[in-house]
């Protein structure tokens, strides 16, 4: 059996095997360094687990996975995407946590005729008229999940809310989605620095605002720091905290009991009752000693989607894989997915 390669930085790597065997190459871009590396490592773990489950093959073809560390920098992401396509000649570019990075690589990859599959980022500008037929999302459009939170808080009769998110594309999308369904009073709408770790000034302003509830989007380490500082400041007595993509499998090991009582909306849960999810969660816990996050689940699903597309089409051709994915019925941890079109 041909082995598959995991590389933590961009590098050329060839698998050992038969001289004329066809190999599918996937460039998987995520953040593996810095504070955001906690998210990227879960995604890398999930990709490796999926490849183990598939015996190192995708759709029956020998497979090579090349991991690229984007360092959470758009310019680095663009350079890596070009290298993956031009030097490594990958068949698929996948992954991407951050919406500003996906915005940076979207046009170069799709216009090259390469299939681009997002495991997480879903910036609203690339839906609708800016959508490209070579782009597929295995997650969401950013505004969708906070729309659910907005509807919940509206239905719950919450009269006023304070909003907070990082100042980048996803943060703006999240709050826009929330406001689409929440019609109460917005006491404040604050955009923090991406990667910010100290929220004392924001908490002071929030306390003074007197909002009945607070809704935040602060993924990864930002959410860990925010919730810890919220608790230390005794903010539970001031405002009820609601979150999207802020309290999850990435942050729970650090937050522990501090997360109790915080409500969030999400499209995946480790206790979803289907065979694929049970195997994924069970094997992930056994191998890595912790529950997976939704980031990990979506990374795992991305590999399942590529496997499905190649198996059903019998090809790694972009148009043929794209056609299979558009038809839906993709087996994932969330059940069999259907695909809509935003083109």
Cite the ranges covered by each PLM segment.
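Extracytosolic ligand-binding ectodomains
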Residues: 2-10, 21-343
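N-terminal signal peptide c-region/cleavage motif recognized by signal peptidases
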Residues: 16-18
């Amino acid at each position: 059996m041909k082995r598959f390669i995991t590389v933590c930085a961009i590098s050329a790597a060839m698998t050992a095997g038969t001289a004329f065997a066809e190999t599918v190459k996937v460039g998987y871009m995520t953040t593996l360094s810095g504070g955001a590396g906690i998210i990227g490592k879960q995604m890398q773990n999930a990709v490796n687990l999926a490849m183990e489950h598939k015996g190192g093959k995708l759709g029956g073809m020998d497979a090579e996975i090349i991991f690229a560390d984007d360092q959470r920098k758009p310019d680095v992401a663009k350079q890596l995407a070009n290298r993956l396509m031009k030097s490594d000649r990958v068949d698929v570019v996948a992954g991407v946590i951050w919406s500003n990075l996906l915005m940076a690589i979207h046009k170069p990859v799709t216009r090259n005729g390469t299939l681009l599959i997002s495991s997480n980022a879903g910036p609203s500008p690339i839906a609708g008229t800016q959508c490209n037929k070579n782009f597929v999302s295995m997650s969401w459009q950013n505004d969708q999940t906070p729309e659910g939170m907005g509807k919940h808080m509206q239905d719950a009769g919450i009269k006023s809310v304070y909003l907070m998110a990082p100042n980048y594309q996803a943060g703006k999308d999240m709050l826009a989605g929330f406001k689409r369904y929440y019609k109460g009073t917005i006491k404040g709408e604050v955009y923090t620095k991406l990667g910010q770790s100290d929220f004392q000034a924001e908490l002071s302003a929030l306390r003074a605002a007197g909002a009945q509830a607070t809704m935040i989007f602060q993924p990864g380490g930002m959410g860990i720091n925010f919730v810890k500082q919220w608790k230390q400041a005794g903010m539970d007595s001031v405002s009820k905290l609601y979150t999207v993509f802020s309290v999850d499998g990435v942050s729970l090991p650090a937050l522990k009991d501090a997360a109790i009582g915080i409500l969030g909306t999400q499209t995946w849960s480790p206790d979803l009752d289907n065979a694929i999810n049970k195997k994924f969660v069970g094997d992930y816990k056994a191998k890595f000693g912790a529950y997976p996050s939704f980031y990990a689940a979506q990374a795992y699903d991305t590999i399942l989607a590529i496997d499905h597309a190649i198996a059903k089409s019998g090809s790694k051709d972009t148009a043929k894989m794209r056609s299979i994915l558009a038809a839906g019925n993709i087996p994932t941890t969330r059940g069999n997915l259907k695909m809509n079109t935003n083109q």
